[in-house]
Regions:
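Extended amphipathic alpha-helical segments enriched in small hydrophobics
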Residues: 1-25
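C-terminal regions of mature proteins
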Residues: 19, 27-105
């Protein structure tokens, strides 16, 4: 059903505007940070996934501190930094909208 497509797109743009105007609330950042750290840990919990991660590092030309820096970045990012990144990289004028499903009239 397409009735939610336009409201959904508008809500995405509203969230982008909000990120431009105000820093992410600390409670929300903490929730996302915990989720990301948990996902990072889960992706390295088996010998095979850890081997895959090291293969990724080797084939991408990254150094052996890549994982440590990633964890540090997630732990240390501030609401102000996220706002600055949103202002720099989330430009509504350059976004492309892709909609899957029934053709809109």
């Amino acid at each position: 059903d397409n009735e939610y497509v336009e409201p959904l797109i508008q809500e995405v743009y509203n969230e982008i505007d909000k990120l431009h105007r105000e820093p992410v609330p600390m409670e929300e950042l903490t929730m996302v940070r915990n989720y990301m750290l948990g996902e990072m840990c889960r992706s390295y919990e088996s010998p095979f996934s850890l081997a895959d991660a090291w293969i990724f590092i080797a084939t991408s030309g990254l150094d052996d501190q890549y994982f440590s820096r990633s964890l540090q970045a997630v732990n240390e990012v501030t609401p102000q930094e996220i706002q600055e990144l949103a202002q720099r990289y989330l430009c509504k004028e350059t976004l492309k909208e892709v909609i899957a499903g029934k053709k809109l009239s």
